[in-house]
Every structure is written in structure tokens, then in C-alpha cells.
Amino acid sequence: MARAAALLPSRSPPTPLLWPLLLLLLLETGAQDVRVQVLPEVRGQLGGTVELPCHLLPPVPGLYISLVTWQRPDAPANHQNVAAFHPKMGPSFPSPKPGSERLSFVSAKQSTGQDTEAELQDATLALHGLTVEDEGNYTCEFATFPKGSVRGMTWLRVIAKPKNQAEAQKVTFSQDPTTVALCISKEGRPPARISWLSSLDWEAKETQVSGTLAGTVTVTSRFTLVPSGRADGVTVTCKVEHESFEEPALIPVTLSVRYPPEVSISGYDDNWYLGRTDATLSCDVRSNPEPTGYDWSTTSGTFPTSAVAQGSQLVIHAVDSLFNTTFVCTVTNAVGMGRAEQVIFVRETPNTAGAGATGGIIGGIIAAIIATAVAATGILICRQQRKEQTLQGAEEDEDLEGPPSYKPPTPKAKLEAQEMPSQLFTLGASEHSPLKTPYFDAGASCTEQEMPRYHELPTLEERSGPLHPGATSLGSPIPVPPGPPAVEDVSLDLEDEEGEEEEEYLDKINPIYDALSYSSPSDSYQGKGFVMSRAMYV
């Protein structure tokens, strides 16, 4: 009993020592309900205006805000208090930097202090004319009753958007690395990042100096390579990245390298022969700046009289033995000189090997085209045959898997034939009679035997004898009594429709039934009996 009593919960009130602890817990819980909402980082442009948001959330009825202050904990002691706002005394800016000229409360608007309860919930502070010294941590603090003091901290960053430019440097051909382009990002904070985009063999050299504005940096990147004619006219791209840019700045630069002429000679086709009149040599030049002079000469010192120099071209009026030499084209510009040589071999007769080679090349191309067309045609034919075989196999599978295309005669047709034999064989109503002539068994009575719907054609013996159609020499002909008069039109119509359906069904099974059927009886057979030989049953 004592143990059970010990397990029962105690119903005694809390001891007096627990009341202060419970009160502290309630106060701490209530204080956590109110918080200060600030941004962890705010960026402002150098020389511009920035707002530092600060809100007391959530609005609590009966909460009294006694004071709002902004402080800079990392500033010197005499500059830590930046701004304050009292419900009755209004705003105050004790620190000379930034001072009242550059600070203001956005919501309170430095009002007279009347009706400021709602305004104090929003303690957003605005800074005008940002300088580099304004960068740092700012603390927004609310002194409230009965919740106590709550605060939030914001980091203010002062950035400066740089000004970018890129330009090419006019350089002259040399064997040493030289700066051929510059990319400059001026007065940025923080310093900009510069890179180059190019397929040339290059390297970049970067320097940083202080900008004209305090706290800014100017970055210069030099695009360096060994200047040559290959680099002249090539476009490279300067890429500048900065946190104030939404996307990197891309600045194209076209390089300009001055170099002496690079010369080559064209026009010789290895088919110069004595007496040829349509020969020409051309001096092809690539240079910067443009060529200023062309000079044609030979290594032998003898210049053919039938060759005439016309600037960059050498026109030959008639080829003779003097052209068996080496021609030299010399080109000059403001940077230097370049030359090229071309050896000429003069033949006695035209060279047909080149024409044959050209014809062989053309023939080979045509043969390749024809072979490709034949191969493509063969592939298409094979694919078509394979497709047709696949479709045919699929159709055969469907035919094998599906139900049979015919069905045996229904018992209903036989029963109807047995019930109305006289109606089927009435010669007087030929328009309603069936297409097939029935036959009878001689050994059975007319009422017991089943009426057949088709019979075989007469044999040769039957055709040669004087028997009636359907009779044979194996037995005596059996007379068929004439049928009763025609029934009513309604019965004949029904019988006609059912007969046509059965006729179509049997024709689908085997078309030979149509060939074996007799035509409709004529008027000459009316009133006569019909006989059938029993030989077909043997």
C-alpha cells in the first residue's frame, strides 16, 4: 500500500521556490516572440543612397517601444552611436560621421514625435552620399516594455561600378613578346577581374593602382605575344567581371601588327611550252601596311623580252627558251621587304599528262557518284523487299490465327426445306423457285426423304440416251409428282430471302455450285414430273 501511494501523482501546489523560476521562463518565452528583421548584407553604390531595413516583428498589442538606436560596433568609441529615435524627443544623430546631413529615418521622416508608435515598428535608416568609410557593421536595436531589448545586425558594403575600355596597340613585327592590346577597368570597388578569350599563343600581365576616387582600384591587363603577320587582324575579347554587373562585360579588340610583306607566286601550271601565249604569273602579297612597290626579276639575270611586268602580275606574250629560269618577285612596304621565287620549266610540246590526270580525277568522281547511287538503290530495294516479306508474314499469321472464313450450313435451312417441299419445287411459281433443282430417292416416299438442294450434271451416257434430264441407265426413272399450288406471297418472299442468303453462303464456300445449278424451269415443263437417277448414290 505504501508503494502504491508513492506512485500516485502529487496534487500539492508548487513550492514557493518554484514561482520565480516559472516567472523567468514565461518572460523568456514572451521575449522570444518579438524579433528584429534585418538583411544580413546590404550593398550600396559609392556616392549613392542606400537604405538599411529594420523592422520589429510581429506587432504585439500593448508593446511599448521606448527607444530605437543604430550603432556601429566596429567604429571608434566616439562614433559608435549613429542614430537614435525617441517616441517623444524624435530623431537624433550623435555621430558627426555620417551626421544628420546624410542620415534619416525612412518611416519616421524625422517627425515631431506625435503618433510615432506605428512608425517605430519600422526603423529603416537611409544613408546618402555613400563613402568608403561608411562600409561596416550596423546594429539596429529596439528597447521595448515589457519585452526588453532586441537587436539585429546588417553588413553594409560600399561598391563602385567600374568603367571598362579595351584598345589595340600598334606594334611592329619582332621576335620578342610585346603588348598588343590593353584592357582597363577603372575605379572599381572591389577590383574587377579581367580575362582574355583568344586562340592565339598569348599571356596576360595585370597591374592594379588606386583610382581617383578614394577606395577604388583601377585594373589594367596587357595582352602579350610575339607580334607576327599571323596575329594581324585577329579579334580577341576582353572579359571583365564585377559584382555590380548582371553579366560579364565582353569587349572585342582587333589586333594590329605591322609586318613586312609575305609573298608567294601563283599561275604556273607545269605546262609551259614553246609558243604558248596565255601564261601569267601573279605575285600574291599579305602585308601591313600595304605594299608600296613590286619588282620582277630572274636569278639568271636575263629577263625575257616577251614578259611584261604590270604591278603584281607578269604577263607573258609568247613563251620561248629564255623562260627556262627562276622568276623572283620582290615586294616592299613601310616595314620591310619580302620576296618569293618560282622555277619555270619550258617544254617543247604541251604536256598532256596533266589533262589526263584531270580527266582521271573527273572520271573517278563520276564513278564514285554512280557507285554511291547504285549502292543506295540496292539498299532501298533490300529494305523494301524485307518490308514486304514482313507484311506478308504478318498477314499469314493473322490468317492462321483467325477463325475460319466459312461455316457449315445451319440446321435451320434443312428443317425449312423438309417442312415445305412442295413449295420449293412448284413449277407454277417459277419466280419464287430456288436456282438448284432437287432430286429424290426412289426408295423413299416423298414425305420421308430429305430434299437436296443441288445435283450433279448428267454423265455422258445420260446425254447420249433419250432420257429426261436427271435420268440414267442404272434404273428406271422415277416420276416426280407435280407440286401443290403456290403458297401466299408472304411465304414466298420469306423463302426467297432465305434462299438467297444460303445461295450466297454456298457460293462463298465453293463457286462450283453456281456452275452445277440448273436454270429456272420453263413453261413447257409445267405440269410434268421430274425424274432423277439413282446412279449418283452408288
From Swiss-Prot:
The chain crosses the membrane at residues 361-381. The keyword Signal applies. The modification Phosphoserine is found at S433. Residues 1-31 form the signal peptide. The keyword Transcription regulation does not apply. Ubiquitous. GO terms for biological process: acrosome assembly; adhesion of symbiont to host; cilium organization; coreceptor-mediated virion attachment to host cell; cytoskeleton organization; establishment of localization in cell; establishment of mitochondrion localization; fertilization. Keywords: Cell adhesion, Cell membrane, Disulfide bond, Glycoprotein, Host cell receptor for virus entry, Host-virus interaction, Immunoglobulin domain, Membrane, Phosphoprotein, Receptor, Repeat, Signal, Transmembrane, Transmembrane helix. Residues 32-156 form the Ig-like V-type domain. The modification Phosphothreonine is found at T410. Residues 32-360 are extracellular. This is Nectin-2. Pfam families: C2-set_2, V-set. Belongs to the nectin family. Disulfide bonds join C54-C140, C183-C238, C283-C329. Residues 382-538 are cytoplasmic. One of its GO terms (molecular function) is receptor ligand activity. Glycans are attached at N137, N324. Changing M89F: Loss of entry of HHV-1/Rid1 and HSV-2. No effect on PRV entry.
